[in-house]
């Protein structure tokens, strides 16, 4: 099993998504958080198999929400750097990953 670490930026992305969905409907934020948590947990068994989409970043697609989990491999550890709504402009996504 691969270790998974989540960066502060990715945690902020998750919080922003939670707040957005919770504002749409009470309880939807909790559902979003649970789904994305499960998606990130999948990295423990599948990290490294996703294709590289930008520089060294790999992307795991969320099973429920239109989000991508962007991560890199550092040895035997998958590091989640960003959790991004994929409805955003691809140029914006690339700029965010450059940061």
What would you call each of these model-derived segments?
Residues 1-33:
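Arg/Lys-rich, positively charged N-terminal/basic patches that mediate binding to nucleic acids
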Residues 68, 72-99:
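Enriched for short, Lys/Arg-rich terminal
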Residues 38, 42-79:
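Basic/aromatic recognition patch in beta-strand/loop cores that engages polyanionic ligands
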């Amino acid at each position: 099993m691969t270790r998974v670490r989540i960066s502060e930026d990715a945690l902020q992305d998750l919080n922003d998504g939670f707040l957005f969905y919770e504002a749409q409907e009470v309880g939807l934020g909790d559902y979003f958080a649970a789904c994305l948590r499960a998606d990130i947990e999948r990295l423990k068994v599948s990290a490294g198999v996703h294709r590289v989409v930008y520089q060294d970043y790999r992307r795991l697609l969320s099973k429920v929400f239109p989000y991508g989990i962007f991560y890199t491999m550092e040895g035997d550890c998958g590091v989640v750097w960003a959790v991004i709504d994929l409805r955003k402009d691809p140029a914006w996504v690339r700029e965010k990953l450059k940061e």
